[in-house]
C-alpha cells in the first residue's frame, strides 16, 4: 500500500509529530490536510528539538511537504516558522514546501475575533486564540481570502471590502474598533511576493505524484475526538480531524488516504474544557502529567490526565477506519503498581460502550474500569519487543483486544529511534 494517513485517535497531543517524523523516512511526500497553527508538534532529532505548528513534519527530513487546501494558513506565522527552522539549519524553499493555492488565509482580524469571543464567553471552549475558528467560518461563508487571491490586487481589494462588511458589525458588538481595510490590503500586498513562490495547485501535484508510484504520508493535526462532527461538541476544533478529511483536505480523492494509523497514548490527556470520563485529579494524575511532561506545545497549558479509555479509542477506530495504532508514552506508566483501563461507561442504570453525542450524557458518564498489574522495570528507550517487561506486554495486548486494532508501532521515548516496529504501515 503506497499511502499512509496518520491521525490522533484521542484528544490530540498523542505524539503524532515524532511518528510522522519517523515514518517520513519511508515516505516521499508529507501532506497536512486540516487545521491551522493551533496544534503543535515537537520533534526530537539527536540533540536538536524542533517545534512545528503549521509546517508538515516532513520538512525536517528534507521531504517534499505540502500544506493542503483543508488547512487555514496564517501566512505571517508560516514565514516565521520557516525562518525559525532556517536558524536551526533546515533550509525551506519552494522546492521543498508547497502551499495549496486554494487554501484560505487566517488574517489578524480572525485572531481579534477569536480572542474577543473567548474573553467574553461565560462557558469557554478553550480556544488557542489564533483565529482558526473564525477563518473556517469565513471559508464556509464564502467570503475568505485564499492564497490565489494574492495574485490579483483589484480582486483582493473587493474581497477585503466584502470581508469587512461581515466583520465590522461583529467587531462593533464585541467592543473592537473597525478594521482598517486599506492597511490590510497593504499588508497583503507586501506579503504576496514572499508567499506566492510556494503556491501551486496541490491537488494536481498529488495526482501526478501518486500516478508516479510515490509514497504519500498524510499528517493529521489534533485528534479525532476533537472533530467538529464526531467529537465532544461544542468542545471541539473547527475542522474535521478524522481520516476521511485527508481526501477532501488534499484534493487527492477518497482512495488517497490508504492505511490509516491511529496515534494513541498509553493513557489519556486533554487540553482545555470538555468532558473527560477517566480524568484523574489525584496523585496518579499528577504523576502522568509530570513524568509525561504534559504541557501544550503551542499554548504551554497543562494537560488534564487520566487512565486509558478503550471505549473512546474503540469509537475512534470505527470512525477513522484505523488499520493499526502507534502506542506512545508507554514509559510514563513505568513504576505504577496498578493500572486501570476504561472498558465502557455507566449512564444511569445502563452500561454503554461508546461516547454518546449529547453533552449532558457525556458529563454524566461513570467509567467502568478493568485493573491490571503494573511493572517496576523501565520501558524507556526500548527498541525491541523482547526488551519490554512481561506486564507491559500484557497491557499492550489487552489494549489491542479492547479497541479491536493491532499495535503497529510502539514509542518508548521522544527520541526518533526509540520506536518498536511491529508492522510497517507502508507495506501492509
Curated annotation (Swiss-Prot):
Binds 1 Mg(2+) ion per subunit. Substrate binds at residues 297-303. IMP binds at residues 13-16, 38-41, 128, 142, 222, 237, 301. Mg(2+) binds at residues 13, 40. Pfam families: Adenylsucc_synt. One of its GO terms (molecular function) is GTP binding. The active site is at residues 13, 41. It is found in: Cytoplasm. SUPFAM superfamilies: P-loop containing nucleoside triphosphate hydrolases. Its main location: cytoplasm. One of its GO terms (cellular component) is cytoplasm. Plays an important role in the de novo pathway of purine nucleotide biosynthesis. Catalyzes the first committed step in the biosynthesis of AMP from IMP. This is Adenylosuccinate synthetase. It comes from Phenylobacterium zucineum (strain HLK1). The gene is purA.
